[in-house]
Amino acid sequence: MAIDINRGTAGLLELPAEVSQDIWAQTLENSVVQRLARKIELPAGGLQIETVLTEPEAGWVGETDEKPVSDHTFGSKIIAPYKVALIELFSDEFRRDKAALYEQLVQRLPGALGRKFDRTVFGHDAAPGDNFDTLAAAPDVALTGSHEGYVNALTSVAAAGGDLSHWVLSPTAEIGALNDVDAAGKPLFLPDVQADGTIGSIYARPAVKSKAVAEGTTVGIAGDWSQAVWGSVEGIKIKFSDQATITKGSDQINLWQRNMFAVLVEAELGFRVADVNRFAKLTQAAAGE
């Protein structure tokens, strides 16, 4: 029985190990979260991040009066790396006879890592561990076809001490925003595609588009992305094997016996936010509801 990628399968080519940096760049391009959040250097053992919770407050004083004493308050979180990985199998004949494996893998494998990372951060998939934050508990804000939903998102983020910096919209939310108007009847969403990945702005805040943000009634995420950090331990790793036995579902696949090889791509990533309430999930009822 033929298994997975062979000469009859359309779409991939051989990936030399030295292209790891190119692959990592593609992973960044496929992850909205990694573009918007602040990147930190993440050691293998994790890192304690100090956060400022409140600011000191000054006061007016009269002549000879005691000066007020006020302090910052601090908090801390541990950001730890967790491994995200993917193995894909190919036939030796496919590697020999097809000339496009490198190009296709550059496009596909990084996208898989980026999508998984984003879906986890957005709260659609479970966190890999306790020291990895998601936005699953962010407050819901309903988009109702007018400006009110976007104003409510701004208000929700501000009430938690944040300043909404970016909108992350699904294709559905983008279409909805194009039809929405503000209180004066003017278009709410101002399209303006830029090289940095933004597609326009809503209330002077840049908007970016991501398919990964859509799940159920959630069509977008808005928030103060200066309050989010992500890190990677060593970047992306790529490994090849034609000797291993791979478990796929209930099948044990001996690569040597079948003249096949496996490509493994993996990375160790972490994500933390100072306060999940400085984000908002943009929701929209399904058509007909």
Spans of model-derived segments:
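Assembly/oligomerization interface modules of large self-assembling protein complexes
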Residues: 2-84, 206, 278
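Extended oligomerization regions of viral-like shell subunits
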Residues: 43, 139-261, 265-267, 289
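Structured loops at beta-to-helix junctions and adjacent beta-edge loops in soluble globular domains
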Residues: 50-53, 91, 170-172, 210, ...
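Short loop/turn segments at secondary-structure transitions that flank enzyme active sites
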Residues: 55-56, 94, 115, 173-175, ...
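Short helix/loop capping segments that flank catalytic or ligand/cofactor-binding pockets
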Residues: 57-60, 98-99, 176-179, 272-274
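Alpha-helical scaffold segments that mediate packing/assembly in large oligomeric complexes
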Residues: 75-78, 85-163, 266, 281-289
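Composition- and surface-driven signal marking solvent-exposed, interaction-prone regions
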Residues: 102, 180-182, 251, 275-280
